[in-house]
């Protein structure tokens, strides 16, 4: 089975198009060659009817993945203009002299800025017809027309100066000039709709109508499933759990690992409705009010649209939110993001955001499933839950929304350009919601209280004051971080006896709320009530589509390979796979033999031993004369 990197296909396409552009062929021949190159790329991925028929269809990527890979290819040409763009813009500026200055300025702009300015001009020209109708109802030059004209100027800010001039003494000349703007602008709008800005290849890297219909039907099916399988969140439990996270001391998080970032990263997303990449990297937040921030850096937008700021709600104090975002981004586990976004080489065609998301989703999603107690839940669910909470909390009471419906509310707070996209963010409902609910920040430290009940037993627990000292140390640790897990490694730096530590942990296990798990290590008892309320009918996990606007990014496509050919036998792609198979075979021959890791000498006469047996992991720490004796003691501790 031969596999080809999608990056190789895209780089091959780019090289071929560049060679065509650099050739001395007539432009008509270049266009034909470019179209053929785009067709070859599409056939390799999806459209080759000879390759993808019969059983070959099983190896073909989905239409949605095809669309995402097409987007990757298109992005490589984003900064290139159409070969006739300059010539056509010059013609337009000569044909429409009243708009010549605006059109001519495009010739010195990069492609992204041209698209932005063109979009603004088109939006302005689309206002000509309604503006002309409104003006026809005003008798310009009369005494009572001034107020009406000022009101109209405020209604159409892009035309404000031209409209305001109608209140001047030479209003007739200004009116005639405005009508000329209307006349030329109406024709210009039609010509702009036919103006090709992008490189020629982009017009051939498009989905067919059948492919687009297939994708749209899948989105419709996903939406239908969501609407008929809502998820109920217990609002007080969910928010209390989120507040418990953000109220912890920052030192209580293990921010040296990606998995250690998960609790704080999810909590910040839950409180703001922002995407993972917006929280971790590209979002810019500044305090705008007690529970509002100004947000810049919306993901899944063209580069020219990312400079638009939005005012969004935070479900906690905005100052605390911004502070925690900065703390999270400056932690050691996020220090290598600049390297990650560079990718693994020229054939890594994922977006920078996609590269970050690939490593973080793997680290964060397992924690989210545990936190919510539901294997169907993932990090991005925080966005939809936030939208529902924000709607219940603010929509009916904030004057900002008095003239709009709920669809506009969801669109605005989520940053969508399309009112239909927000329909996918209504899968969650809230149970026990109350606008007057407040988090319990003064809750008694139950573990500390339970430990304090053991105080009277400590003087006789060990020789001298050893029992009292280890007990006081544990109480201090639990007071600083109520959720800390106390283990051998936690107490070893305090130089307590290696025999005393496991004895104390066993004695205080109930007070600490800990137990020895299947892996032989201490675990915290999770007695928190369920956040996701049980369904009457358990749903199977749904292969969801991340639908954010019409610009679908490739963040979820972590696999950079596709199968482009078939063979009868299966081959191992790397030698490492063969080695793993050999190890597995040996393990099958000797199922009863424990697998020890090399014992770790702690330097104080004690050893740390870990081993696996019967599919379970075991750990032991204690005094021993040598490594062999340590391994024997570890085995005896569990299997006498």
Swiss-Prot record:
Transmembrane segments: none
Biological process annotations from GO: DNA replication; viral DNA genome replication
Binding-site list for DNA: 275, 300, 383, 416
UniProt feature, compositional bias: Acidic residues: 545-585
Entry-linked InterPro entries: ResT/TelK_cat, ResT/TelK_cat_sf, TelK_muzzle, TelK_N, TelK_stirrup
Record flagged with keyword DNA-binding: yes
GO molecular-function term, one example from the UniProt record: endonuclease activity
Assembly behavior: Monomer. Homodimer; in presence of DNA.
Similarity section: Belongs to the Caudoviricetes Protelomerase family.
Function description: Converts the circular intermediates produced by the viral replication and carrying a joined telomere site to a linear DNA molecule with covalently closed hairpin ends. The viral circular DNA is cleaved at a palindromic site called telRL thereby generating a linear prophage plasmid with telomeres. Binds covalently to the 3'-phosphoryl of the cleaved strands.
Name used for this protein in its record: Protelomerase
Organism this protein belongs to: Klebsiella oxytoca phage phiKO2
